[in-house]
Amino acid sequence: MNLIKLIKNKLQLKSFDEKVSDFLDKAFLKENNDNLIHNNGNLVREDSKLCVFEHNFATGIYLRRMILARGAYVVGCIHKRDHVWFLLDGYVTVATQNGKQDYVAPYVGFAKAGTRRIVYAHEKTIFQNVFQNPFEYRNLDKLEEYNFSLTKKDYDDFIRSRDIKSS
């Protein structure tokens, strides 16, 4: 195999996580604008033209709602625990390490721990996540730490520490 084919094959072997990480590294170098909103590697909580967030609580549950503008992309964090999500209104394409799929509201989805999603809103969309909140947190920092990892490394560290504690 010649060198060009070898390099080309290696480039194509980048994992979903590596591609997302590369994209985010480049995005964090840019200033927020009408088309790009980020929080320098932390979860975005502030409303913008692209996305509005609502946080609600019920006993043992944290509800995180995103109202996405048509054409908005969201790169989610890695979820530490299984959870349920609802597409209440709209039409989205969701990409994960398993590929991409289109969803039209109404839809109920189940996400496994370790999943990171990239969501594209083809039209105005209401996307509702339902997370565990066994400690009844109301502090978003604590809820995010409990439910999300911002990087693959953080998620892998979480899994290792959980496995050590359960041994």
Which residues are covered by each model-predicted region?
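A short, N-terminal "cap"/entry segment at the start of jelly-roll beta-barrel domains
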Residues: M1-G60, Q97, E145, D156-S167
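Conserved short histidine dyad/triad with adjacent acidic residue
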Residues: Y62-K80
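Surface-exposed loop/turn positions
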Residues: A72, Y107, T115, E123-T125
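Glycine- and acidic-residue-biased ligand/ion/polar-headgroup-sensing regions
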Residues: H79-N98
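Structural motif
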Residues: V84, Y91, R116, K124-I126
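Short acidic-glycine-tyrosine-enriched beta hairpin
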Residues: T96-R117
